[in-house]
Regions:
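Acidic, polar ligand-binding/catalytic clefts
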Residues: 70, 74, 78-147, 204-225, ...
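C-terminal motif of bacterial Sec signal peptides marking the signal peptidase cleavage site
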Residues: 14-16
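Bilobed "Venus flytrap"/periplasmic-binding protein-like clamshell domains
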Residues: 42-51, 61-76, 110, 130-186
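Extracytoplasmic small-molecule ligand-binding "clamshell" domains
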Residues: 24-106, 331
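C-terminal functional modules
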Residues: 283-344
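Sec-dependent signal peptide recognition
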Residues: 2-8
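Short, hydrophobic alpha-helical packing/hinge segments within bilobed ligand-binding/sensory domains
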Residues: 31, 68-69, 92-97, 184-190, ...
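Extended ligand-binding regions for polar small-molecule ligands
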Residues: 18-26, 67-70, 74, 139-142, ...
Length: 344
């Protein structure tokens, strides 16, 4: 009997060892390897939010979130063009990421505990600090959000914007009539057609909507900001290697701005005496190899896409239709709260 029990124990032990070995092999073949073999990154973005992600008439994508996806591609392949963009509305974004049909979601998405924990996603960081506001036509002569009692409000269902709106109106003893929309494009159409009195979403989205109006001067964003909306890219939980690649792509862009490295001077900076600059560009250290990538990981990102500040100015800054100031999205040492771990 003892001999039989010993045989059974040994068999179970061997099976357990083999199972662990199998699991280890599966874990080692992560998404980064899959992306490398496929030859491009699949990135989920907003289907139509000028300044953040939108297509022109020729089908070319541009925007702050689009630049981030291109940066991920540049860091992996040394080529920022190896990206397939998938336009998604608010209802589609999480199921599409969870299903594995996209590698990363960079779609003006707010980092919350429920999305982080319940949906089993990991946010790579914050690439835009925002807050929810209200856009109204000037002819209504509304000066404050506290005057919106009874208003017809264009709102995207099942978003943080809807939850914040409910809280704000309840706390101020007001009521509203929801006009549900599919996204910013649908909201603009309904707002400009007079189907709702006000559109509420992240302030950056309101700036984008106002810029797209036939006459932007006929629309005003009210002064109240009713929420915190830290927006950033996210990936599925359970793949630390891929999460690190996505996260440090963002951190490279922000650290590069802090170090004064731009797409215009990146080649000159290769000879910089600064140890930080050398680490960012791969002249010294092993930042790229630590992520499973090449030595020119940081260099390729900055050379082909630029640092965070360049991307901001190009897509949403004061000289664009959105005309947004850096505000909270300025570097920590220049009055903002943009602060990321060092390259060390």
């Amino acid at each position: 009997m003892k001999k039989l029990l010993m045989i059974l124990f040994t068999t179970l032990l061997l099976v357990g060892c083999n199972t662990n070995k199998s699991i280890k092999i599966e874990q080692e073949v992560g998404l980064l390897q899959t992306v490398k073999e496929r030859g491009y990154v699949v990135c989920g973005v907003n289907a139509g939010l000028p300044g953040f992600s939108a297509q022109d008439d020729a089908g070319n994508w541009s925007g702050l979130d689009v630049d981030f996806c291109k940066a991920v591609s540049a860091g992996i392949f040394g080529d920022s063009s190896k990206v397939e963009f998938v336009g998604l509305n608010a209802a589609q974004r999480f199921p599409t990421l969870a299903s594995g049909n996209i590698d990363v979601l960079a779609r003006n998405t707010t980092w919350t505990i429920s999305r982080d924990v319940n949906l089993m996603f990991e946010f790579a960081g914050v690439n835009y600090y925002d807050g929810q506001g209200f856009l109204v036509p000037t002819h209504l002569e509304i000066r404050s959000a506290t005057q919106l009692d009874g208003a017809f409000v264009c709102i995207t269902k099942e978003t943080t914007s809807e939850l914040n709106l409910n809280d704000y109106f309840a706390e101020n003893n007001m009521q509203y009539q929801p006009i549900y929309v599919e996204g910013n494009k649908d909201a603009k159409a309904k707002l400009f057609a007079g189907e709702c009195d006000v559109f509420t979403t992240d302030a950056s989205g309101l700036a984008s909507a106002r810029a797209g109006a036939e006459d932007p001067s006929k629309w005003v964003v009210l002064p109240e900001i009713i929420s915190k909306e830290p927006l950033g890219p996210l990936v599925r939980q359970g793949d630390q290697e891929w999460e690190d690649v996505v996260r440090w792509t963002m951190f490279i862009m922000i650290n590069a701005e802090e170090a004064g490295i731009t797409s215009k001077n990146v080649d000159l900076m290769l000879t910089s005496k600064s140890k930080e600059v050398k680490r960012i560009l791969g002249v010294e250290g092993y930042i790229g190899p630590m992520l499973g990538l090449g030595m020119k990981f940081g260099y390729n990102i900055i050379q082909q896409v630029g640092n965070y500040g360049e991307s901001f100015e190009r897509n949403v800054g004061p000289n664009t239709p959105l005309a947004l100031e850096r505000g909270l999205n300025q570097l920590w040492n220049k009055g903002g709260i943009l602060y990321v771990p060092p390259i060390r």
